[in-house]
């Protein structure tokens, strides 16, 4: 996903990469064209420098912990896109928390069983039509 964002997205600034295992983030950076990404060492820095934050984590607890840390800073107006495959109740809980902090939340899980491709496209198209500024210059991060 990061490689596609960098190669096919219209990014004016480098993609910000964070991983709980720093080596994974630096390994990913090495696979992306030079100058197109930077690695940060903590969630707070990634979120503070970003307008759009993608998360893709292994389980419900990891997503909850990550977003709980992410919303501690100023997230007003930011867009969080979670691509993790987690329980719908967890997704609803996370959406509520993110929105209570003044940010926006889109669930875009990675498996068709949870949300089919047309459904994902519809969700994203709806979000972008309501918030066209997200299609313009933005700082993106992924973790």
Predicted regions and their residues:
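NAD(P)+-binding Rossmann beta1-loop-alpha1 motif at the extreme N-terminus of oxidoreductases
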Residues: 1-55, 114-117
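Short amphipathic alpha-helical segments
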Residues: 2-3, 29-30, 65-68, 92-95, ...
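A conserved hydrophobic position in a structured secondary element of the catalytic/binding core
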Residues: 20, 58, 135
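Short low-complexity, flexible loop/linker segments enriched in glycine and/or proline
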Residues: 33, 70, 121-124
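Rossmann-fold dinucleotide-binding core
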Residues: 85-143
């Amino acid at each position: 996903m990061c490689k596609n964002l960098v190669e096919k997205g219209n990014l004016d600034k480098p993609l910000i990469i964070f991983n709980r295992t720093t080596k994974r983030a630096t390994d990913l950076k090495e696979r992306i064209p030079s100058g197109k990404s930077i690695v940060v060492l903590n969630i707070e820095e990634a979120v503070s420098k970003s307008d759009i934050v993608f998360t893709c984590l292994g389980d419900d607890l990891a997503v909850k912990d990550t977003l709980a840390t992410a919303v501690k800073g100023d997230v007003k107006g930011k867009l969080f896109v979670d691509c993790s495959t987690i329980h719908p109740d967890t997704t609803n809980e996370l959406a509520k928390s993110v929105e209570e902090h003044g940010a926006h939340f889109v669930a875009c899980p990675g498996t068709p069983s949870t949300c089919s491709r047309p459904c994902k496209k519809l969700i994203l198209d709806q979000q972008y039509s309501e918030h066209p500024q997200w299609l313009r210059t933005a700082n993106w991060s992924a973790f």
